[in-house]
Amino acid sequence: MVLMIVSGRSGSGKSVALRALEDMGFYCVDNLPIILLPNLASSLMPRNTPAAISIDVRNMPGSSEIFEKVLTKLNKKFSTRLIFLDANHNTLIQRYSETRRLHPLSGNHLSLEKAIDEENILLEPLRSRADLIINTSEMSVHQLSEMLRVRSLGTKERKLSMVFESFGFKYGLPIYADYVFDVRFLPNPHWDPKLRSMTGLDKPVVDFLKRHSEVHHFIYQTLHYLNQWLPMLENNDRSYLTIAIGCTGGKHRSVYIAEQLADYFRSRGKNVQLRHRTLEKRKE
């Protein structure tokens, strides 16, 4: 089992690194005390899932000998790698000034500069044992994520997951969606008493919508739009692209359209997920 330990100076990008590793399929735990590392790793071993653990200065043991013993113990059972993130002194000061966050050691009545210096000393045992040291001073969030992907997986490729979700406007917008398409202008099966109790998954509703040319035009133009920009989105360091399709109740039109879009991209080898928000709520 691969066990990635992520540490480094506060403000150097540990949270970004942990999110990137999580996107790569690692089971991630933030700010775990070092003495608990062996127990956690052992509990994860049956899953054979790669894990990433972040450690900051607040979780350092009282002596470097304790850390050495823990790391030696882990190396006997796991494929352990220690990544240490660093940044220049002035860069760290600038980042803290921009975010206005408190340094973890500032609570000890230290100025920001002294807290940064003190942390640097305390983290030296970790830095000295690191398999990889990354200075993030001149790196963007995307560049750090890309470097970790290449170093961890040995490839720059990561497959984008396209999530198609139908919903009803009457129940509210999905705020996490990257794109929202409103299909309330399309012919509504709700007004046909025979179709009202059905959904966009049922053949009579599907046949009803297929008979209308505007439905075909909407699907065609939406596919054209997504196909046009998908290559750039795939290269934009994202794991998910969520496309929400909304009609009034989230039962007929949006369900059918989401199904059609998902089928198209699935047939072209894309990693596709499909959700019907309103229909799932009805089952609960």
From Swiss-Prot:
The entry marks the following residues as binding GTP, namely: D56, V57, R58, N59
Q: Where is this region: RNA-binding?
A: 266-284
Highest rank taxon of the organism: Bacteria
Q: Which residues bind ATP?
A: G8, R9, S10, G11, S12, G13, K14, S15
Disulphide-bridged cysteine pairs? none
Output the SUPFAM superfamilies linked to this UniProt entry.
P-loop containing nucleoside triphosphate hydrolases (SSF52540)
What GO molecular functions are on record for this protein?
A: ATP binding; GTP binding; RNA binding
> Which UniProt keywords are given for this protein, alphabetically ordered?
ATP-binding, GTP-binding, Nucleotide-binding, RNA-binding
Q: State the family named in the UniProt similarity comment for this chain.
A: Belongs to the RapZ-like family. RapZ subfamily.
Q: Which HAMAP family does the record cross-reference, listed alphabetically? A: RapZ_like
Listed under subunit, the entry gives: Homotrimer.
Against PANTHER family, the record matches this protein to: RNASE ADAPTER PROTEIN RAPZ (PTHR30448:SF0)
This molecule's function is given as: Modulates the synthesis of GlmS, by affecting the processing and stability of the regulatory small RNA GlmZ. When glucosamine-6-phosphate (GlcN6P) concentrations are high in the cell, RapZ binds GlmZ and targets it to cleavage by RNase E. Consequently, GlmZ is inactivated and unable to activate GlmS synthesis. Under low GlcN6P concentrations, RapZ is sequestered and inactivated by an other regulatory small RNA, GlmY, preventing GlmZ degradation and leading to synthesis of GlmS.
Name-wise, this protein is RNase adapter protein RapZ
Origin species, per record, is Hamiltonella defensa subsp. Acyrthosiphon pisum (strain 5AT)
Ranked from the top, the taxonomy reads: Bacteria, Pseudomonadati, Pseudomonadota, Gammaproteobacteria, Enterobacterales
Q: Which gene encodes it?
A: rapZ
